[in-house]
């Protein structure tokens, strides 16, 4: 006695019997058609023809790309925030009254980069942790003359400024430059150790990583132990990216398997920025 497989869908069963005949629909053949029918019934994706894994990967990639573009392009905006315009106006008037004596030629560090406070070419520029550039004397005056209870907010984006990074070199040893370095160190000593949220650390990534990698590949920059730690982090991220052993293996989850790779690399970049901030803090205590 022959045993036959029965479809749950009677229409599919009638079509198979009519085309092949019931004698041909034996167990191996029926098993194959049954599995194909079940796979078609279970293939219910959000968009027909595109798997849900691909959709999730595309959405996550677009979100990360949008965040990165926002972090990179926000520095293009150089207009003073409306809440800070009054303080900046007072500072500009004070700078104009102090310019009775001709000022020395300004040293150029950034091509066509102007300070948003004094509206002149940036002189001995200082960069905030949010990535905006100002004259060193302008941002210090903005801090001194403002009624701040703690760290200042950026005159442009209103983000809390917890770190000032000098962009000019150490060749100039004039009295004004020495006083400016002391003021910058004083500010960093007060506010660089403030607790930071995870979102604030992410927003600081482009600026801190740029300064960290610049010092890694410069002579007399960071000490060798910190350089070795950065190299180990980069090597660990590279080997994890090419390793077949993953928390979310690509063989099982397809494109979604790459998300954990990018997440690990992202965490390592945040760790490098935290280390660099600690190095700057240690310099202030020497």
UniProtKB/Swiss-Prot annotation:
Pathway(s) annotated for this protein in UniProt: Protein modification; protein ubiquitination
Membrane association type: Multi-pass membrane protein
Loss of function: phenotype: RNF170 deletion mice show increased expression of type I IFNs and proinflammatory cytokines (IL6 and TNF) in peritoneal macrophages. The mRNA levels of type I IFNs and proinflammatory cytokines in the heart and brain are also significantly higher.
GO terms for MF: ubiquitin protein ligase activity; zinc ion binding
Major enzyme class: transferase
Cytoplasmic topological segments: 74-229, 273-286
GO biological process, one term: innate immune response
Primary location group: endoplasmic reticulum
Transmembrane portions of the chain: 53-73, 230-250, 252-272
A GO-annotated cellular component: endoplasmic reticulum membrane
PANTHER family: E3 UBIQUITIN-PROTEIN LIGASE RNF170, RING-TYPE DOMAIN-CONTAINING PROTEIN
Oligomeric form and interacting partners: Constitutively associated with the ERLIN1/ERLIN 2 complex. Interacts with activated ITPR1.
Protein name: E3 ubiquitin-protein ligase RNF170
